[in-house]
Amino acid sequence: MSPNDTRLAGRTALVTGSTGGLGAAFATALAEQGAFVVVSGRDIARGLAVLDRISSTGATAAFVRADLSRGAAEVHRLAEEATTAAGGRIDVLVNNAAMLLAPAPTANVLEQQVTDAFAVNVVAPFLLTGIVAPRMAKRGHGSIVNIGSINGLIGMGGSALYSATKATIHSLTKSWADEYGPRGVRVNTVAPGPSLTERNADIAEQLAPLLARIPSRRASTLTEVAAAVVFLASDDASGINGATLSVDGGWSAI
């Protein structure tokens, strides 16, 4: 870290679903700004790789394995183990873990798929916030950044289920901002548009027709989306609560 990378010095952060892709970028960016980050996800090897990446920047972090599809007990375990790993408190919570869903007609989606998608994308962050936010409120400060999506902001045929889960996250942000804001806890959403990660880099050419519809004519970078998360987590955004910050190249504006 450079001497100027201290916006989050002395803070602790938990980033769910941070063993790869956007989540790993969020964890790394928060650590680079001085936060002690708890990385979390299902894959131990990938989690340790993210720790190595963070360590290479001169920052420190810990890893807590968690599979948020396993229900309330797993969410509670993550909250307690992450709090312990972070030295007794979590100052920043990034609700990033999500089940990505392939486009499909609504009529082809099975009931179990609906249950599974909402379990990870909605129920898990709902329960985790219900544990972490009151503790933040008791201390009088904290920042929660929910990761939404362009899918939760606009209509997108073939993506009804995923869009519904993300629209729910956007709604929860507003409710939680009102619930916890008076006690010093800010809750905001970052809503990414198309972004290239190691998981979808192989379909970059297939995204070309989609990107042609976006004012910026390109996908967002991981760094750009992570910068939005860092901003909302930091005191630079102290006056922002209940907002959705879109990082989509202007797609949601048209």
Task: List PLM regions with ranges.
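Residue(s) in the substrate-gating loop at a strand-loop-helix junction
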Residues: 149
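Alpha-helical segment proximal to the catalytic Tyr-Lys
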Residues: 134, 178-182, 238
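Active-site helix of classical SDR
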Residues: 129, 165, 173
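A glycine/serine/threonine-rich, flexible loop-to-helix segment
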Residues: 107, 182, 189-214, 224, ...
